[in-house]
Amino acid sequence: MILFPAIDLKDGQCVRLKLGDMDQATVYNPDPAAQARAFEEQGFEWLHVVDLNGAFAGETVNGAAVDAILKATGNPVQLGGGIRTLEHIENWLSHGLARVILGTVAVRDPALVIEACGKFPGRVAVGIDAKGGKVAVEGWAEASELGVIELAKKFEGAGVSAIIYTDIDRDGILTGINWDSTLELANAVSIPVIASGGLASMDDIRRLAAPDAAKLEGAISGRALYDGRIDPKEALALIRAARKA
């Protein structure tokens, strides 16, 4: 079980959105590299980064900020947002990313994801963002008719290192993780699942540490960490205890 602190990048700054709406962005730190260092100093072992502008543009927009983050932290970093081609993937992995997260392209071109997994084993994750049970693409701006589990099953046996599952209806509003849909997905596939969207309090951390959540690889926390609703020291102690159980 891993707790991933999140850095969402918009216009070079560390922000959080409400419900994935770019017009509802709160700036939490104008210096993403400093934020990355702070998370490492707090004891976190990984970092989850999203290029929000890139997700809408279909290509990297906040590259300078990501490079600064990679230089600032010794922790492994996973990046999503605007990564749509093998060239994009190879470029970022050569820059020092631990793994890339493929979202829109996983819907548009599943074969590319499978090819990437073969070329970069263990370094490709799939991001599945859902609204009303259906997969959303293009920075959450478009809905598809594809179901979450239907999409996830396309990558069984392909070598996908993890699925990052985000419930858009809960993202950034501190209402708690959608445990039913998250655990349903985790139990439907053999690929490790990381929960995202809605992590709200220490109660959610305790729920993550419960035995029935053991199938999850971890969870991503953004706003609850920035707002002080989750205490890093206490949360990490609970997560580490769950690993040993």
From Swiss-Prot:
Active site at 8, 129
Q: Any idea what this protein is called?
A: 1-(5-phosphoribosyl)-5-[(5-phosphoribosylamino)methylideneamino] imidazole-4-carboxamide isomerase
Localisation? Cytoplasm
Signal peptide feature range: none
Q: What class of enzyme is it?
A: isomerase
**NCBIfam families with a match to the protein in the record:** 1-(5-phosphoribosyl)-5-[(5-phosphoribosylamino)methylideneamino]imidazole-4-carboxamide isomerase
HAMAP family hit by this protein: HisA (MF_01014)
Protein family according to the UniProt entry: Belongs to the HisA/HisF family.
Q: What is its EC number?
A: 5.3.1.16
State a GO cellular component annotated for this protein: cytoplasm
Native organism? Sinorhizobium fredii (strain NBRC 101917 / NGR234)
Keyword Amino-acid biosynthesis attached: yes
Against PANTHER family, the record matches this protein to: 1-(5-PHOSPHORIBOSYL)-5-[(5-PHOSPHORIBOSYLAMINO)METHYLIDENEAMINO] IMIDAZOLE-4-CARBOXAMIDE ISOMERASE
- Domain of life, per the record? Bacteria
Q: Output the GO biological process annotations, alphabetical, semicolon-separated.
A: L-histidine biosynthetic process; L-tryptophan biosynthetic process
